[in-house]
């Protein structure tokens, strides 16, 4: 597996987590029902490296079993720009978000947002990813 688990102990990771929470607050402002849910947390941050032609191409969603039922949302932060391929694609929304350095995407973890990572075609893809959980 081309991933690494990171903790929020270093300054750069803490800075990123603070920015992620700021984005989450903006997300919640659009879906006010989440105000009543309570505390959210980020259990882990994964750093993924995807080589050309690789990726997680299978359609999936993030809360697909009881162990993952506490996942409210998934997120991904693109660490580099991929010129061809490497998009995150959502099945039912019919959209593809390209891998552009610095972009952060947050989406519901439920089956309504079934998605996949398309393979990068023109170089490696680097991504921080994880979940907002109850």
Residue ranges and their predicted role:
Residues 1-104, 112-134:
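Fe(II)/2-oxoglutarate oxygenase catalytic core
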């Amino acid at each position: 597996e081309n991933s690494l688990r990171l903790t929020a102990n270093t300054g750069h990771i803490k800075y990123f987590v603070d920015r992620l929470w700021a984005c989450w607050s903006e997300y919640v402002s659009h879906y006010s029902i989440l105000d009543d849910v309570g505390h959210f947390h980020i259990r882990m941050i994964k750093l993924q490296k995807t080589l050309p032609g690789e990726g997680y191409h299978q359609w999936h969603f993030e809360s697909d079993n009881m162990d993952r039922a506490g996942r409210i949302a998934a997120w991904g932060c693109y660490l580099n720009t991929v010129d061809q391929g490497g998009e995150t694609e959502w099945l039912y929304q019919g959209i593809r978000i390209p891998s552009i350095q610095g972009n952060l995407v947050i989406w519901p973890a439920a089956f309504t947002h079934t998605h996949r990572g398309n393979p990068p075609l023109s170089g490696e893809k680097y991504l921080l990813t994880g979940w907002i959980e109850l």
